[in-house]
Structures are given as structure tokens and as C-alpha cells.
């Protein structure tokens, strides 16, 4: 019997942060973007409703969910993609936009899944140096080549906690070639109260 060989991706595995620390019982972990409050009691009540028929496959297009999201954020539902967490959306972006030998720029310290999914499709990951643990617009622009297809960044950034201002983010978009996709990960936007900050959603949804 011939056993098929696995394809050797030669990529690093995702390494999650610590969830437990010795001698500490009550820990609020922010790095995984998990709710420290747990599930909403209202959500629990709705899920327990037998009329929902959760044993059936859901709508693959998530039309109802996208419609409700579009109402809340005042944007076109046709511009909304739903996924099983940001991981799946990042994976879809890489599969749709990247070919082998294309280049993807990511900050020096950033969410590992950007580089993992880019590597899986055969793209080259290029790291832009951070200055004092802050994403640098000039360093990203300096790394751009004719092969650059995507720039991934989280704003505010995980794990550094620093951020690009509204002015810096708009400057980056302006300086990038129009053919380069700028992916702004807003996972931690709700923590930002600084007046000079604007989420990618607020800046680019239209």
C-alpha cells in the first residue's frame, strides 16, 4: 500500500500566549482577544432556544448577520465578510490575493497568522522594522517592491500595544500603490480612547 506524502510547508506553528500563571487565580488575558466577562446571558438564553435548530448548517452567506452588522456600522452589507474568527478571514484573503513568490509585508512584531497563511500559499513574508516597538510607515514603504501584494497590520498592535494614528494610517494608504491591499486588523480597536486614533473600519468602510 502506497501512503501519500504530506506536503512540506516548512512553516512555524502558531504559539499561543500563556493562559495560566502560577499562584495567580484571577487572570484577565487580553492577548488572545477573548472576553474576560464570558458569554452574554442574553446570548446563552437565545442559544438554548430549541426553535433555533442549531443542529442544522447555518446560512453559508451569513446574510442576516451581515445585514445586522451593516445597520450597526452603517456600511454596505455586500462589503462584509463573516468568518470563524479573524483567522479564517486572513486565510481567505491570502488564498484570494496571493500567488507563489508574491510578497506580503508585516510589522516586525505582529499576529503570527498573517505570516503563517501567507507562507502556506507560497508567498514571501517581508518584515518591516518597528521603531521602539511601534509600526513605522516609512519602514513599510521602504520594503515595498513590484512583488508586494498585501500589507497586514493590527492597529492597535498585538503584542506591542502601540498604534498608528489616523494621520499615519491615511499616510500609509496614500503612499502604497493602489494595487496593494492594506489589511487593517481592528481586533483591539475597542480599547482605544486616544483622540488621534481611528479604526480601519471608520477610515475605509466607504
What are these regions (language model features)?
Residues 96-153, 174:
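PLP-dependent aminotransferase-like
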Residues 38-40, 90-91, 114-115, 160-161, ...:
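Glycine/Thr-rich phosphate-binding loops of Rossmann-like dinucleotide-binding domains
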